[in-house]
Amino acid sequence: MATKKANPLMDRIKEEFPRKLQLLYSVSPEEASDKQVYHVLSSIIVEILGAKRQSFINHTHSVGGKQIYYLSMEFLMGRSLKTSIYNLELADGIKEMLKPYDINLEKIYEHEPDAGLGNGGLGRLAACYLDGLATTGFPAMGYSICYEYGIFQQKLEDGWQTELPDNWLPGGSVWLVPKPELSIDIHFEGDLQEYWDDRYHYISHVNYNTVVATPYDMYVSGYGSDGVSVLRLWTAKAPSFDMEMFNKGNYDRALAQNSIANAISKVLYPNDNHHEGKSLRLRQQYFLCAASVGDIVNTHMNVYGTLENLADKVAIHINDTHPTLAIPELMRILLDDCGYGWDKAWDIVTRTFAYTNHTVMAEALEKWDVNLVKTVIPRIFSIIVEINNRYCQSLMERNGGDSAKTTRMSIIKDNQIHMATLCVAASHSVNGVSKLHSEIIKQSVFHDEYENTPEKFKNVTNGIAYRRWLLQSNPGLTQLLSDTIGKKFIKDGAELENFREYQDDKEVLTKLMDVKKENKEAFAKYVKNQSGIILNTDSIFDVQVKRLHEYKRQHLNVMNILSDYAYLLNDPDAPFTPKTYIFAAKAAPGYYLAKQIIKMIWAISEEIRKNPKISQKLSVVFLENYCVTLSEHLMPASDVSEQISLAGTEASGTGNMKLMLNGAITLGTLDGANIEIKEACGDDNIVIFGMTTPEVNELRARGYNPCEYYNNDNRIREAIDRMYRGINGCTFNDVANSLKDRDPYMVLADFDSYRKAQQYITECYEDKFKWAKMSLNNIAGAGIFSADRAVTEYAENIWHLR
């Protein structure tokens, strides 16, 4: 009889577990608290991953392999213990090890806070890519800031969002490995001095203020591979306390220097509705870029001893415009520290950087005031000015002296530095994140740049770490898939396509419905434990969970709910398929209208809750403090996936992919990745409404007047008037006025189509086998949205890894 092969990692864990408990806490496994078990298990996993990473990167260096450095202002990592144990294929072994001590591994996971390093889709995408890069075996390091308080903890007080510090480090620091020997000095403010020496023009930066960047490493395991990615996070500190200044009585000045430095790594996206907030955000961005580029250069020099081959051995990827200052920072190092001439330095830079754009909206493309940049980072400002001068000169030559086109393409104009334009000018690749988005970039956002250098522009549709969102989050569905199509899909998402063969198998469809029901029951139990809210699991779970922004049109959803509510108020006994609308979203602290929309959702939920007869049929729930962990519970339980942004405004989305993977039916516009979801699942398995991007542009060109829709549609008028009159005792005049008078995202124009789509999706749900078949086809088509596929496309087409 064959014996089961011993897992060497498991043998090590069994040995280390009681030893570390005794060493750190002086307790045995029988005596240990769940929190102590969490810390010890986490520390063991970190050591295992650290050793794997060292071996992985040593091999990369030995073969002269190219490394990927992924710069992003945010990485929405979620919890690490469960994912790491799963990816290392240790879950069963650890559960077995803990069983004699009556320790429940699922309860241990609950002691880990979500790492407070991100906010929305941008950060979650970055986290998924670190997972995908490790799984596919590409050597990668992410760079970001170690935010002490993350984005914020959202708390609703009488429906109003309040922001509390997200104090994640006490529980999360076990995953951070300090690397103080790699600290880097970052220079702010100061003066520039120019001089010539041996016919070389030197610029010296003097009288600057120094901030010390100290790195902490977080390891990200791949699934079933030798790969381990690293997320290097920088903390900011003043170099030392100025005791002399303090002793002279200059207390405020001595403390202020420390305070400014320490503020840099306190909070993600500080409110920038005032000058101080803008200054802090700029400091954060330069701090991230200077520390990361300095570290990349130091690592490269330690291995190769030259920067001549930097672009051959290093790919630096800019995830949205926040890390754009990495471009002039690398120029600064090459010019000032290494003595390169401009042309050679620029050649290295433009072969090293690639840029992913994440927005098509002009107002969201980052711009910085010239005077602010000149004051805070004077040397970087002077380099940007020179880049712009040379870039504009080359454009004039290329475009036959077309000064108007050159002005449109200029990096500096209207006293502002356009960061996206700088990225396009300096990167060898510019990509969008869905087919539609990439076309919009070429045809409108960067049309002049596309005409100038069409070979730069590419598309890589977003992908998700599907093992986290399916295998870890939805074990019931995973088991059903394994029973029907085998286990190859665990390593290769494309294998999910084989599930489509069962779309007419009533036994499989029944099992699929059973899995969904179990997931809804489990989610309802989770919500009740967390918030006391009771969900009707026999109702449709209609889900819109994403950052709160007008372009995502949560208020379109609200208008339909108000219309349903008015219908039931008029006739409580009217036929109505029970539906629960589930919202979760954070609004930026300074975004007042978004906060009003949250308050309005909460007010509707409260008013309906107070009406027992109606609340049996219609209910609205707003879940506080949306995060990765909440999402992992919600995605498997969702029936309807609301992806209702105005066509042409959402770059791609990733929540739509996670919901599709878990069998939810998309109710959406032809925007972002919804178009590709439609292609993947089939036209009959998605519900599309609203204008297309060309129709939106045509209506805007004709002159969109929302008041006409208000005057001509009774349901629209009734919903908006209800906002004016009040919901649960609170009026929402600002939201109503924004819709009736401006409506920048054409909510009213799409409302009738949206309402009909809602009615149709409800009809589909009532036919249980039809709905299950639609759900199955979504699951089967979701493999294309794997992060493994996405990072492989980046590696082959953009980073040129072999």
Region locations from a protein language model:
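A conserved ligand/cofactor-binding region detector
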Residues: 1-802
